[in-house]
């Protein structure tokens, strides 16, 4: 699927992220917190793979045809987690994005970044990557420039765009897009 024809869904808009000032932070239950530039990531343990995924909202009534396949290139998530040194007792890895929206929490409107999580076991799968290229081109803005999490075999919502932080923790993450929307039971 071409970059232009690959389906688009976002929950909080499309933030502008500057490649030159971009930083990815790795925090939480790690031995070494990381603060990585785009260049750091592009010079890491790079893999390339053909991966397709679809929107979790696909149906005959609401959304239809939100599916795509592309050639992705990026650094392995495992290499980043290994460099940070995930501590014993860690259970989940939370992926925070640059896109921010309003959520109502206990009757108050609060700014929250889009986020999804994976169990440690799912996060360390060798095919997971932090993608910076799509179909041989730098990752387009509308597909998550400069870095997008790619989790082959999962619905599109798990493939967090505009990634800014990876946080390792010992509890389940229960943000809106894990605990209320897109709930997996």
Where are these regions (language model features)?
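Structured, non-membrane catalytic/scaffold regions adjacent to prosthetic-group chemistry
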Residues: 1-185
